[in-house]
């Protein structure tokens, strides 16, 4: 058995940085309270996330794979796309996708999710962990960040944990891509317990 490490989400997050020419390395401007949104398939959990406990919370284990959708979607179907091989190698562990986006608007997020789905990337998926997009709160013609992801992820009838501390809106939890992890959501927070093996 390998060494076990644990990381959890943060209480607050930064919607707008105080970084400027005169202050290139400011402290975080933590103005927003983290509120996770959790779905099973395309339906939101009935138990409020902050009331989830060890019995009613989300608990799932598997291999982590993912990153920034802006970059990943450009690899689908190319000679650098080894996702199918990774998925097949770790199918017995199951796959937990962690994804976030930087410059994609909500329509581009939906297209990226569709493209990854059609490339077979979500085979053996056990859960999705979705970070806050840089376009947090954007709504375009009735499409928001949640429905953009759920259009693809919701089909798999697995937990979809959204607004997680990942990606381009800090702070971000360290994620070890390829690691095996036990993921839990309880009392309004997410915890990743890594098992290095």
Report each predicted region and the residues it spans.
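Conserved anion/nucleotide-ligand pocket segment
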Residues: 1-70
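Generic, ordered loop/turn and secondary-structure boundary motif
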Residues: 53, 65-66, 76, 123, ...
């Amino acid at each position: 058995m390998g060494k076990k490490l644990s990381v959890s989400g943060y209480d607050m997050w930064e919607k707008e940085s105080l970084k400027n020419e005169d202050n290139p390395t400011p402290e975080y401007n933590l103005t927003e309270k983290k509120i996770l949104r959790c779905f099973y398939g395309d339906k939101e959990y009935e138990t409020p996330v902050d009331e989830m406990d060890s019995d009613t919370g989300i608990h799932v284990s598997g291999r982590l794979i993912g990153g920034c959708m802006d970059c990943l979607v450009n690899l689908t179907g190319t000679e650098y796309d080894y996702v199918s091989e990774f998925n097949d190698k770790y199918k017995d562990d199951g796959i937990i996708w962690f994804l976030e986006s930087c410059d994609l608007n909500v329509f581009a997020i939906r297209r990226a999710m569709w493209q990854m789905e059609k490339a077979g990337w979500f085979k053996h998926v056990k859960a999705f962990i979705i970070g806050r997009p840089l376009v947090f709160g954007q709504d375009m013609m009735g499409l928001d960040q949640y429905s953009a992801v759920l259009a693809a992820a919701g089909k798999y009838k697995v937990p979809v944990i959204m607004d997680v501390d990942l990606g381009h809106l800090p702070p971000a939890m360290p994620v070890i891509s390829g690691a095996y992890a036990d993921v839990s959501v309880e009392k309004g927070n997410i915890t990743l317990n890594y098992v290095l093996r």
